[in-house]
UniProtKB/Swiss-Prot annotation:
Keyword flag Transcription: no
Gene Ontology biological-process annotations: negative regulation of signal transduction
Pfam families in the cross-refs: RGS (PF00615)
RGS domain segment(s): 137-256
CDD domains associated with the record: RGS
PANTHER family per record: REGULATOR OF G PROTEIN SIGNALING, RGS DOMAIN-CONTAINING PROTEIN-RELATED
Top-level division of the source organism's lineage: Eukaryota
Name of the protein: Regulator of G-protein signaling rgs-11
Gene3D superfamilies associated with the record: Regulator of G-protein Signalling 4, domain 2 (1.10.167.10)
């Protein structure tokens, strides 16, 4: 199915009146089968509000892509939640912990070399209690600078570095309160970095979604929602229950083992046997 590119002048009123649209939208979770549509440019699973970084994006998605409808949140019958990866990454973007490369590098190097904590600075690695707290919730994991860095590393291994960085850049742009001049420059930077035909870190993006982004850029300077659908598309690739999977990954387990080993050494007075 080919999708005609609609002018934002036609799209935006529909988005503004999304509340009316939402009331008239009746979708059964089990009734959606994306594969039945003739547009085979991309294969997507059944979508729901949990798959989106902002629930408002579901409205945009459904308006722009009616042949790939996503079920929206029903406050009367469903608990408000979204994918673990999106919860964590959103908090990471807000805390600006995405560039803590030094932290994650030190952790990775220490874990790989199995150097005992007695030989490491107390600031090199997180404490045992901090690592244990990561198990409790995605929010506590995201609240730790070490947890942020390590989870991002894990997610990049699960998907790709470019996709994770694109998602984070989009989120920072969306949340920014900077002047319109900066936002306009940032829009073009993201396009040039990830979406243009000659982008050095080009990510796979459906043509129709890219066309929407370009129309937004052309008609509205620095619009905060420019990349919403593109960001949502990339977010769909992140694994579900990623918090649980992270806690089962060697990246986390090796670090936990190392910290426990270091605690044991410290308790026995740094015996040589450690």
């Amino acid at each position: 199915m080919s999708i005609a590119i609609t002018s934002p002048c036609q799209i935006f009123p529909a988005i503004i009146n999304a509340d009316v649209y939402e009331k008239n939208l009746k979708v059964d979770d089990n009734a959606i089968n994306v594969s039945k549509y003739s547009d085979n440019s991309v294969s997507l699973p059944t979508l729901s509000y949990e798959d989106f970084h902002h629930f408002s994006v579901v409205r945009h998605w459904n308006i722009l892509f009616p042949y790939r409808l996503a079920t929206e949140w029903n406050w009367e019958s469903r608990r408000l939640r979204k994918r673990d990866a999106l919860v964590i990454l959103e908090l990471v973007a807000l805390s600006d912990e995405t560039n803590k490369r030094g932290s994650v590098s030190r952790i990775m190097n220490t874990v790989r070399s199995k150097v005992h904590l007695m030989f490491s600075s107390s600031t090199e690695l997180p404490s045992f209690q901090e690592i244990e707290n990561w198990k409790k919730s995605p929010g506590l994991l995201a609240a730790s600078k070490y947890g942020c860095a390590l989870f991002i590393q894990f997610l990049k291994q699960q998907t790709s570095e470019n996709e994770v960085d694109f998602w984070l850049d989009c989120q920072k742009f969306r949340s920014s309160t900077a002047k319109i001049s900066w936002k306009n420059k940032e829009v073009h930077r993201i396009l040039d970095q990830f979406l243009s035909s000659s982008a050095p870190r080009k990510i796979d993006m459906e043509t129709s979604i890219l066309a929407r982004c370009m129309e937004y850029v052309e008609h509205i300077e620095g619009w905060k929602y420019t990349f919403d659908v593109a960001q949502a598309y990339v977010g769909l690739k992140f694994p579900k229950e990623s918090h649980k999977k992270f806690l089962e990954d060697p990246l986390y387990l090796d670090l936990l083992e190392l910290v426990i080993s270091g605690r044991s050494c410290n308790k026995v007075g740094h015996k040589k046997s450690c």
